Design a protein with these regions (language model features):
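Glycosyltransferase catalytic domains, chiefly GT-A lineage
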Residues: 1-168
């Protein structure tokens, strides 16, 4: 089985697909999308959306790779606007030798560190206002942010931008 894949999702044209800086031997690159994309390194898998919501469509693939990538022993999810800069085999040996899953903190992203769901919500609102394309329903986001702690803001916590899995 020893097949390995790096995968991403782009629905509704929210992100631009970034080409990897490093293309490791023995790894496939797959992008699940509902738009016409072209890439030198990514295999574009155009799919019919499950939902009428881009965020939920993306999460269908992000959170459930075993349903869509069952032939792969190892899978690494990255956000569509992220890129591979180093050998993912090192990531597998460092983080999955004694675990089945590893999550990676958005705050460690050197180009765009964020550690707070409230900051993320503000960025989604700003992006939507500028571009007319919201990542999710703004009213739903506001409701979730208010409901989270009865209107009180909590200490910011990590967000997941990448996930590695041992699928065997």
């Amino acid at each position: 089985m020893n097949k390995k894949v790096i995968y991403t999702t782009i629905f509704g044209g929210y992100d631009e697909l970034t080409e990897p800086h490093f293309v490791p031997d023995g790894w496939d690159f797959i992008c699940f999308t509902d738009t016409d994309l072209k890439s030198k390194n990514w295999k574009i898998v155009k799919t019919t959306p499950f939902y009428n919501d881009n965020t939920r469509n993306a999460k269908q693939y992000k959170a459930l790779p075993h349903r869509h990538l069952s032939d792969y022993e190892y899978s690494i999810f990255i956000d569509g606007n992220m890129t591979i800069r180093n050998n993912p085999d090192e990531l597998i040996s460092n983080y999955l030798s004694n675990s089945n899953v590893a999550f990676f903190d958005h705050n460690k992203n050197l180009l765009d560190p964020r550690d707070c769901i409230y900051k993320e919500a503000e960025i989604i609102f700003e992006f939507g206002r500028r571009n007319g394309n919201y990542k999710d329903n703004p009213e739903l986001i506001k409701s979730q942010m208010t409901k989270r702690n009865d209107g009180r803001r909590e200490t910011c916590n990590s967000q997941i931008t990448a996930m590695a899995r041992n699928n065997k």
